[in-house]
């Protein structure tokens, strides 16, 4: 079993472009000893307007955000939840890199272990083609009040996590989790000056060992 606490995180944004789009909502649940110990949810002032598509998707309007605080102030209220934890999200690179981008703009280096439940679902349920949150909710009969709202989405992800642990041997799940976390260790060996030279665009990345043998091939909406 994992020894570290888990934080399930979900954000809603003004768009999908990291560095240009902004966060409009964040929700977090912290898990310790397989139980929720704390929850956090807040709207966020994106310092820009929300278009009709995003409002239609999330139900969040510009009026809703009028009195919201900007992300650095919101983060101060929930930063303690990240301490010593593993960041868990559905399509984790999206949520993680958005938060990292927001904090980088104020000079804060955000870096914690992360775990993607999309990748974990692919490993545990290879018989299925789609592993979107929508499909997972439908497949497992998970009850959700409001899709595309941050707290409802992470509660759905947490429900799936518990279902997966009932349907699979814990050692199998732990092995897949460890594999994900292990692949991230190579990133810590890359100097920040090298990372800053990478493009902030979608693409494919490959990690090689010292003999130039490919170790891992991945893709991201933001290579940096």
Question: Each PLM stretch: what is its role?
Answer:
Residues 1-112, 126-148:
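Conserved non-catalytic scaffold segment of RNase H-like nuclease domains
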Residues 13-15, 119, 156, 222:
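Short, glycine/acidic-enriched loop or turn micro-motifs at the edges of active sites
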Residues 8-9, 115, 215-217:
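Short hydrophobic beta-strand that contains or immediately precedes a catalytic carboxylate
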Residues 152-223:
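GIY-YIG nuclease catalytic motif and its immediate N-terminal context
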Residues 112-121:
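A short, structured active-site edge motif that brings together acidic residues
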Residues 10-12, 95, 116, 153, ...:
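Acidic active-site catalytic centers that drive phospho-/nucleotidyl reactions
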């Amino acid at each position: 079993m994992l020894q570290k606490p888990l934080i399930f995180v979900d954000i809603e944004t003004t768009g999908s472009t990291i560095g240009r789009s902004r966060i409009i909502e964040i929700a977090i649940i912290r898990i310790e000893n397989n139980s929720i110990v704390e929850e956090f949810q807040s709207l966020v002032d994106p310092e820009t307007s929300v278009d009709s598509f995003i409002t239609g998707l999330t139900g969040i309007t510009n009026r809703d955000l009028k009195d919201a605080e900007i992300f650095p102030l919101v983060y101060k209220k929930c930063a303690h939840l990240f301490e010593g934890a593993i960041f868990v999200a559905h399509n984790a690179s999206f949520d993680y890199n958005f938060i990292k981008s927001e904090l980088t703009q104020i000079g804060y280096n955000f870096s914690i272990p992360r775990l993607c439940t999309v990748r974990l679902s692919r490993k545990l349920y290879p018989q299925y083609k789609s592993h979107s949150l929508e499909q997972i909710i439908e497949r497992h009969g998970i009850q959700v009040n409001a899709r595309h709202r941050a707290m409802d989405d992470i509660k759905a992800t947490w429900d799936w996590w518990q279902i997966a642990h009932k349907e699979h041997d814990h050692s199998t799940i732990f092995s897949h989790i460890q594999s994900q976390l292990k692949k991230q260790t190579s990133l810590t060996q890359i100097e920040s000056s090298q990372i800053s030279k990478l493009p902030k665009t979608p693409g494919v990345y490959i990690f090689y060992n010292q003999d130039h043998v490919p170790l891992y091939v991945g893709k991201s909406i933001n290579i940096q």
